[in-house]
């Protein structure tokens, strides 16, 4: 089934593709000329047979003489098994979606509007967008070689091999180098940075990155995402639940961030202590904690009572608007759909049945294939795979070496100049900002080189004209070596 469903080329007839184009775009009032190189980056076995390909989309500014001081950003999404579609057409490329002020727009049906990305980072950095093996236009040509790519460390090592070859091919080893990952792409970035400076299973890479830009952080001190984190997960989820409750119910007149930080302070002190005390908590204190938890999160006291004050990620999705008969999006808690019922199937999935995925997936896919690829002169008779859910079964989530949080901490220890910027959406239930706070504190990341910032958005936090401007301006600040939080 893997061959038939997810492989649109075989090694017998595979020919590496390469497409070139040129363009110019106005960014911050100035014209920026550039060239693009979109191509297969092929992996071969010991007898020269192609077994896989990473597909890359390189945007290179052409009027720059000193490339040694010009940063290169390598950007990708997550999954694992997800193509670069979201970050590519969302905010990194020279063309992007036109956003509206209403997060519940656009319609899921065409026509869709694509515009020049006047927020693009190409004025300050060259950009390489990456489709990993078996995602997007990336290919797994030999299914028997899946274990060389579809696992945490092999995936990261494949990325490093590609980056090493790209830097050599385009003479950019002396340039500042940044990894930009979204969602699982954050784990990929952390593991790649750790292996780059410390070595992989069979080889060294001897590479250092100037910084990591982590959008929708998935790195934790646990095994995989939030597995085996030695703390109460509802405490980490508290800021996200509070933000979504603020958006839908407006329990106070406080600004969003003021309310969320107040909720976080309650969660990390009174709420956490109450959970720790359990049945030893006096009834009067229990009732007070239950009331305040319901006030901040929007989850009913009755539900909290039934679950001993705790709530999970799925409870944020299903309980905050339960009285309205609506489900929230796991990827953007502002977006809703009518409540899932048994008539729709027996198994509710917070991924497949997600309101934001249903809304934005068709928009991004059509814009990328219908507008962006033709502009890049890409003409390829190959199926573009936005996300390969098969990886959920085939992708090995266990590490043979260090956990993702340990890899990041080790990389920052070995590379004293490496800096990390966590950018998170307040309304993102999938990768909650509380996880980033906890990671920074419990992986003991250097405080002077670690920056965390929340945005009034969801998992794809660049959605919205104000959000994409804020994010890209903050990335520009980060690339200058400054603190993104220093901006108002």
Which role does the model predict for each range below?
Residues 444-460:
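Catalytic histidine neighborhood in serine/cysteine hydrolases
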């Amino acid at each position: 089934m893997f061959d038939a469903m997810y492989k649109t080329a075989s090694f017998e007839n595979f020919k590496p593709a390469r497409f070139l184009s040129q363009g110019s775009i106005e960014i911050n009032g100035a014209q920026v000329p550039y060239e693009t190189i979109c191509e297969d980056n092929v992996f071969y076995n010991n007898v020269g047979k192609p077994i896989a390909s990473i597909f890359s989309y390189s945007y290179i500014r052409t009027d720059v003489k000193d490339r040694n001081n010009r940063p290169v950003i390598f950007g990708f999404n997550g999954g694992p098994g997800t193509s670069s579609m979201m970050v590519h057409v969302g905010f990194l490329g020279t063309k992007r979606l036109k956003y509206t002020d209403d997060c519940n727009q656009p319609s899921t049906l065409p026509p869709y509007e694509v515009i020049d990305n006047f927020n693009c980072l190409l004025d300050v950095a060259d950009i390489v967008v990456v489709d990993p093996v078996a995602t997007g236009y990336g290919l797994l040509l030999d299914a028997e070689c899946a274990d060389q790519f579809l696992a945490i460390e092999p995936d990261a090592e494949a990325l490093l091999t590609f980056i090493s070859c790209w830097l050599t091919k385009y003479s950019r080893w002396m340039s500042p180098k940044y990894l930009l990952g979204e969602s699982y792409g954050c784990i990929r970035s952390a593991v790649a940075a750790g292996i780059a400076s410390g070595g992989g299973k069979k080889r060294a890479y001897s590479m250092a990155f100037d910084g990591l830009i982590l959008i929708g952080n998935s790195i934790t001190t646990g095994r995989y995402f939030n597995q085996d984190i030695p703390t109460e997960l509802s405490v980490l989820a508290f800021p996200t639940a509070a933000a979504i409750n603020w958006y839908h119910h407006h329990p106070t007149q406080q600004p969003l961030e003021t309310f969320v930080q107040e909720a976080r302070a309650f969660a990390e002190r009174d709420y956490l202590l109450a959970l720790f005390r359990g049945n030893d908590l006096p009834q009067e204190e229990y009732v007070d904690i239950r009331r305040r938890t319901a006030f901040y999160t929007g989850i009913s006291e009755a539900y909290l009572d039934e679950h001993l004050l705790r709530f999970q990620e799925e409870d944020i999705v299903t309980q905050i608007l339960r009285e309205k008969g609506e489900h929230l999006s796991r990827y953007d808690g502002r977006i809703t759909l009518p409540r899932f019922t048994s008539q729709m199937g027996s198994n509710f999935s917070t991924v497949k049945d997600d309101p934001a995925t249903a809304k934005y997936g068709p928009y991004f896919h059509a814009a990328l294939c219908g507008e962006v690829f033709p502009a890049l002169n890409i003409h390829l008779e190959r199926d573009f795979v936005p996300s390969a859910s098969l990886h959920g079964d085939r992708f090995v989530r266990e590490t043979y070496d260090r956990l993702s949080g340990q890899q990041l901490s080790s990389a920052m220890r070995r590379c004293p100049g490496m800096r990390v910027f966590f950018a998170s959406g307040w309304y993102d239930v999938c990768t909650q900002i509380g996880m980033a706070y906890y990671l920074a504190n419990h992986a003991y990341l250097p405080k002077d080189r670690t920056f965390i910032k929340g945005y009034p958005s969801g998992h794809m936090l660049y959605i919205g004209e104000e959000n994409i401007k804020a994010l890209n301006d903050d990335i520009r600040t980060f690339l200058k070596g400054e603190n993104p939080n220093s901006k108002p």
